A protein has these predicted regions:
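Short, well-ordered beta-to-alpha junction loops that form the rim of enzyme active sites
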Residues: 84
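Conserved beta-strand-loop surface patch within small alpha/beta domains used
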Residues: 1-78, 87-110
Length: 110
């Protein structure tokens, strides 16, 4: 059984980011390492939703590059994607499902 591990501090950062970005969706890259069936989140890289949308999110190519460079510098990898659904249930939308196929890491939807 696989699981995701993150600290309360990182969880609080994600919740705060989601609240601050309302009414739009928020998003972040989750950096860490996978050991056996455990995805350990060591760093949350908060990103801007360039769509400025309540129903979609896009992370800019520049921010994606910054996130990957930070992961490399810290000897980590992308282990998850976070985004919020401020006006709907926290279940994957059809768009989410499509992009999950391109990014086969755990997705956390809040």
């Amino acid at each position: 059984m696989e699981c995701i591990v993150l600290t309360q501090k990182e969880k609080d950062r994600l919740v705060t980011h989601a609240v601050e970005q309302q009414p739009n969706e928020s998003c972040a890259m989750l950096l860490g390492e996978k050991i056996d069936d455990v995805w350990n989140i060591k760093e949350v890289f908060l990103t801007e939703n360039i769509d400025e949308s309540q129903t979609n999110f896009t992370i800019s190519p520049d921010e994606l590059l910054k996130g990957y460079k930070l992961a490399e510098k810290m000897h980590l990898e992308l282990v998850g994607v976070f985004h919020s659904h401020p006006n709907s249930d926290a279940i994957p939308s059809s768009t989410d499902k499509k992009f999950m196929q391109n990014n086969p890491v755990p997705w956390i939807i809040f």
